[in-house]
Amino acid sequence: MGARRLGRELALQMLYSRDYAAGEAAPLLELVLDESEPGAAAGRSFADDLVRGVLEHRQEIDTAITGASKNWSIGRMARVDLSILRMAMYELLFRSDIPKNVTINEAIEVAKKFGTEDSPAFINGILDEIASTLPDKG
């Protein structure tokens, strides 16, 4: 598994856990990271960036998700799906070094692993809607 995929999976676990536990996300990283995993250091760094970015820009991210999710309030979304969407939205809006299609594809792959059967299509629909309104990166 690549370092960024590992980072996304770690970030998802931290964001999901943070929704249910008050406090900082950093201690959660220690619980979900296997230091022996290849790419662990780079994955940790990327996960940390994603989590901090989502937390810093959460209001703007949630506003964008709400605008693109027809008939779905954030409160009705599955927590795993919402955490994946928040991560991907941070990448789409604030990480110019990651192409839009990579962000969307990675979010779908993470959703296949951690979400429900319907999660990949749900996440793809919302991210495609948002990505179509954003300028190309590069």
Swiss-Prot record:
It comes from the Bacteria. Keywords: RNA-binding, Transcription, Transcription antitermination, Transcription regulation. GO terms for cellular component: cytosol. One of its GO terms (molecular function) is RNA binding. It holds the Pfam family NusB. InterPro entries: NusB-like_sf (IPR035926), NusB_fam (IPR011605), NusB_RsmB_TIM44 (IPR006027). Belongs to the NusB family. Involved in transcription antitermination. Required for transcription of ribosomal RNA (rRNA) genes. Binds specifically to the boxA antiterminator sequence of the ribosomal RNA (rrn) operons. This is Transcription antitermination protein NusB. The gene is nusB.
